[in-house]
């Protein structure tokens, strides 16, 4: 199985690795995956007063495709509204990274993680 140059680039030079303060009311955290079997993805967003994502961070434990999917989605959501970010589909991530069929589940984790982070942020807002 050969990885695309984009997967290799995001794996070797991941963007936005780290974490934001979970206690901050403007930070939403999404944690998805199965710790017992491998891939786990934590994705966090920081939302400004206008509902625009101003920062995004991730920590992913998994294969190169999972890390690349996390890195890519954190780049994509910055500057987007919650609605725009929530509309990102795993198929867009898989297509951009040219993921092989056996790695498409990694892009699904990224889609699930951003949706979970948005839901967490909205829950904090009441």
UniProtKB/Swiss-Prot annotation:
Cysteine pairs bridged by disulfides in the record: none
Database matches in CDD domains: IscU_like
Function: A scaffold on which IscS assembles Fe-S clusters. Subsequently gives the nascent cluster to other proteins. It is likely that Fe-S cluster coordination is flexible as the role of this complex is to build and then hand off Fe-S clusters.
Binding-site residues, Zn(2+): 37, 63, 105-106
Keyword Metal-binding: yes
Source organism, top-level taxon: Bacteria
Pfam name, any one: NifU_N
Subunit structure: Forms a heterotetramer with IscS; each subunit of the IscS dimer contacts an IscU monomer. Upon overexpression can be isolated a monomer, dimers and other oligomers.
UniProt xrefs under SUPFAM superfamilies: SufE/NifU
Cofactor remark: Binds 1 Zn(2+) ion; this is probably a substitute for Fe-S centers.
Cellular compartments per GO CC: cytoplasm
GO biological process: one example: intracellular iron ion homeostasis
Cofactors: Zn(2+)
NCBIfam families, sorted: iscU
Gene of this entry: iscU
GO molecular function annotations of the record: 2 iron, 2 sulfur cluster binding; ferrous iron binding
Keywords of the record: Metal-binding, Zinc
Record's protein name: Iron-sulfur cluster assembly scaffold protein IscU
Family per similarity comment: Belongs to the NifU family.
PANTHER family recorded: IRON-SULFUR CLUSTER ASSEMBLY ENZYME NIFU HOMOLOG (PTHR10093)
């Amino acid at each position: 199985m050969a990885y695309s140059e984009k997967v290799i680039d995001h794996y070797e030079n991941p963007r936005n690795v780290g974490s934001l303060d979970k206690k901050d009311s403007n930070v939403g955290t999404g944690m998805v995956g199965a710790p017992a079997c491998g891939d786990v993805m934590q994705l966090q967003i920081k939302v400004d007063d206008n509902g625009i994502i101003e920062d995004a961070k991730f920590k992913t434990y998994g294969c190169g495709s999972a890390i690349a999917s996390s890195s890519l989605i954190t780049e994509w959501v910055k500057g987007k509204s919650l609605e725009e970010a929530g509309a990102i589909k795993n198929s867009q991530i898989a297509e951009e990274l040219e993921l092989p069929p056996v790695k498409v589940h990694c892009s699904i984790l990224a889609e699930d993680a951003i949706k979970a982070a948005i839901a967490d942020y909205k829950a904090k807002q009441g």
